[in-house]
Amino acid sequence: MSKPLCSTGLRWLWLVVVVLIIDLGSKYLILQNFALGDTVGLFPSLNLHYARNYGAAFSFLADSGGWQRWFFAGIAIGICVILLVMMYRSKATQKLNNIAYALIIGGALGNLFDRLWHGFVVDMIDFYVGDWHFATFNLADTAICIGAALIVLEGFLPKPTAKEQA
């Protein structure tokens, strides 16, 4: 017997759509208004800077000849499938986990779209202190990191008792 989708964690899939719209919209604006390498200061220690990332986080494997595009696309698809199954198996009331999974899926799909459509991931957020610059990243990366942090946080929270779960 199948359970109603609204009673599962899939009820939180709307958050995936929100992350995708914000991420892809921000990347579209960068592509339309910036040339590669352009930088605009927003605040002290924060710039918009158009960069292309052919690898993964911190440009890992960026100069590997192209195979990494498909490797990272496969990883993103696999992670999305696993998290969707986990959302389906969880209750809609397990908010923290489901929000975390939705943020990770939305971020992974945003970067997957870039890899498949452009052949690279559009990055634009440049955080710096003095002359030191953190790796340029995008809103999809931010969603993935927030989702991962929520999963870690959930591990430290007290588990509900059997009575509370009923």
UniProtKB/Swiss-Prot annotation:
Catalytic reactions on record: Release of signal peptides from bacterial membrane prolipoproteins. Hydrolyzes -Xaa-Yaa-Zaa-|-(S,diacylglyceryl)Cys-, in which Xaa is hydrophobic (preferably Leu), and Yaa (Ala or Ser) and Zaa (Gly or Ala) have small, neutral side chains
Recorded name of the encoding gene: lspA
Bilayer topology term: Multi-pass membrane protein
TM region positions: 12-32, 70-90, 102-122, 137-157
Organism: Salmonella paratyphi A (strain AKU_12601)
Superkingdom per UniProt: Bacteria
A Pfam family the protein falls into: Peptidase_A8
EC number: 3.4.23.36
Protein name in UniProt: Lipoprotein signal peptidase
The entry's keywords: Aspartyl protease, Cell inner membrane, Cell membrane, Hydrolase, Membrane, Protease, Transmembrane, Transmembrane helix
Pathway(s) annotated for this protein in UniProt: Protein modification; lipoprotein biosynthesis (signal peptide cleavage)
Function in brief: This protein specifically catalyzes the removal of signal peptides from prolipoproteins.
Leader peptide range in chain numbering: none
